[in-house]
Design a protein with these regions (language model features):
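Short acidic/glycine-enriched loop/turn segments that link adjacent beta-strands
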Residues: 50, 75, 136-140
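Short amphipathic alpha-helix that is part of the acyltransferase structural core
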Residues: 2-48, 55-63, 158-164
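Conserved acetyl-CoA-binding loop-helix of GNAT-fold acetyltransferases
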Residues: 84, 89-103
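Conserved GNAT acetyl-CoA-binding A-motif
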Residues: 103-116
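Conserved beta-strand in the GNAT
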Residues: 57, 63-71, 76-83
């Protein structure tokens, strides 16, 4: 009997990304956001290589199975490009990445633009809608914000978090 393969968490700045990992990350983003969601848009937005950007992903046997990007937007951290490979969905990787991202962010406010059907997922991690639904590349999104831990808005959420 062989042990179950383990997903390895990796983190890097753009400068620290090797070309193989960068290619696998960009391929996953294109496979899901462009091909699967049928959304032709410019994924390469010039933010991946900013000095404050952090890349987090799970890999198994050389395959990037889930990914998230954290941008430093001055007074807030911006979470984006949250993506899970079709073959890895249901394994809880997106939730584990969110927990890791929030650990890295620490006691700073964070924002994201959630695809509308994922609002409840992000709410599990303390995010709350901050504006009306809008279309981005034809997909409904809702702006969300998470206040630093310990504030009145988030202090009761830690106990309610559950894995994805």
């Amino acid at each position: 009997m062989h042990p179950e393969p383990i997903d390895e968490l990796r983190t890097a700045t753009f400068r620290d990304l090797d070309t193989t990992s960068l290619y696998a990350i960009l391929k996953l983003r294109a496979d899901v956001f462009v091909v699967e969601q049928q959304c032709a848009y410019g994924d390469l937005d010039g933010r991946d290589d900013e000095p404050g950007t952090r890349h987090l992903w799970f890999t198994r046997d050389g395959e990037v199975r889930a990914y998230v990007r954290i941008l430093n937007d001055g007074d807030v951290e911006r979470i984006g490009r949250v993506v899970t490979a079709k073959t890895a969905r249901g394994a809880g990787l997106a939730g584990r990445l969110m927990e890791e991202a929030l650990t890295i962010i620490g006691n700073r406010p964070s924002v994201l633009d959630a695809q509308a059907y994922l609002v409840d997922f992000y709410a599990r991690y303390g995010f709350r809608p901050t504006g009306p639904e809008f279309l981005e590349d034809g997909i409904p999104h809702i702006p969300m914000r998470r206040e630093p831990q310990g504030s009145a808005a988030t202090s009761s959420l830690t106990e309610r978090r559950r894995p994805v």
